[in-house]
A protein has these predicted regions:
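N-terminal binding-site loop/beta-alpha segment at the start of enzyme catalytic domains
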Residues: 1-107
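Structured C-terminal cap/extension of enzyme domains
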Residues: 15-16, 20, 206-304
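Generic structural signal for well-ordered alpha-helices
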Residues: 33, 70, 91, 95, ...
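Conserved, mostly hydrophobic/aromatic
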Residues: 36, 48, 81, 94, ...
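A cross-domain feature marking catalytic cores of carbohydrate-active enzymes
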Residues: 47-52, 83-85, 111-113, 141-144, ...
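Glycine/proline-rich, positively charged
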Residues: 57, 116-193, 197-202, 206, ...
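A generic structural signal for well-ordered alpha-helical segments
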Residues: 73, 102, 159, 211-212
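Short hydrophobic/aromatic-enriched beta-strand-loop microsegments
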Residues: 106-108, 189-194, 287-293
């Protein structure tokens, strides 16, 4: 049986009831923040990813819960939202909702460039600006290394022109890690985005240490391992020692592991429900696990 996060929350397994008693608006300054190495600008360590639930929005009923998520996200101190042209309606939804809520200036918008060829890349960037309803995008990263050398050249030109602020590359596939590492060594990048989870620690072998050496910001995708982690802990309660790092749910257990890595700037879990938003942002509050506790978390998950 495949358990998902909703079922775990309904069952109350490993979830402190206190997370549902948090005020709708928590102090913005309570979120843990990390600095972007290239500029010193700080970001909350938990953001929002939009790859699935924002990708097939067709009606007002689809939009309404997402609008409430973004409204409360900003009110609770969040600002990093990650999207991509390949995520269906996601860029348009994010742009429209940000405009309606008048929160664009409060957001750090990140999107991706997944075209081949210079002209196609420029066209896609122009489309992203239009969809996001913004004259400038905070971060654009070459998506899964697609035509990376060509597109990074275009992105640098746009950065110099003030149309984007940060440049990077992304992957969510282990098979690309070697090429990813080579690109990190060859190019000056503000950010990388890579897959990393408590049950998928391969990026910690070479990519994350290299990011530290290169002074590159790190955004983490797939922090729940495509849902595998929630399935792995089905029927299990949080270990008592999770309280030592202010962890109240399995989602926080998984996210606090990620953002306690000293090289990680932020993680962007997919978030389309307010209850998940409140839970996820709990990972950006309180204590984080120390190195020894991180090893203990790894042993715990590996032993399931």
């Amino acid at each position: 049986m495949q358990w998902n996060r909703r079922e775990l929350l309904k069952a109350g397994i490993g979830v402190s009831a206190s997370i549902f008693l948090l005020p709708a608006i928590a102090p913005a300054d309570s979120l843990i923040r990390r600095k972007i190495p290239s500029t010193g600008e700080s970001l909350p360590v938990i953001g929002i990813g939009t790859a699935r639930r924002y990708a097939t929005v067709a009606t007002e009923a689809d939009r309404a819960p997402l609008k409430e998520v973004l409204r409360q996200f900003v009110e609770m101190g969040g600002n990093v939202i990650d999207t991509a042209p390949s995520y269906g309606t996601a860029e348009t939804v994010v742009g429209d909702l940000a405009a309606e809520l008048k929160i664009r200036e409060s957001l750090f918008m990140a999107t991706k460039l997944g075209a081949r060829g210079r002209d196609a890349g420029v066209q896609q960037l122009e489309q992203s600006l239009k969809r996001l309803r913004s004259p400038m995008i905070d971060l654009v990263a070459v998506h899964n290394l697609q035509d990376a050398q060509m597109q990074l050249g275009t992105l640098r030109q746009w950065k110099q022109a003030g149309r984007i602020r940060y440049v990077g590359i992304t992957t969510s596939f282990e098979r690309q890690h070697q090429e990813f590492e080579q690109t990190m060594k060859a190019e000056a990048l503000d950010f990388i985005q890579v897959d990393y989870a408590l049950d998928n620690r391969k990026a910690d072998r070479r990519i994350l240490p290299l990011a530290a050496d290169r002074g590159t910001g790190v955004m983490i995708n797939l922090p729940f391992g495509r849902g595998r982690l929630f399935t792995a802990v089905q029927g299990k309660s949080l270990p008592p020692w999770a309280g030592e790092f202010d962890c109240a749910s399995w989602a926080q257990f998984f996210l606090k592991y990620i953002v306690s890595h000293p090289v990680v700037t932020c993680a962007v879990p997919g978030t389309a429900k307010v209850e998940y938003l409140v839970d996820n942002l709990g990972a950006a509050r309180g204590r984080l696990p120390a190195a020894a506790t991180r090893r203990r978390m790894e042993r715990f998950i590996d032993g399931l």
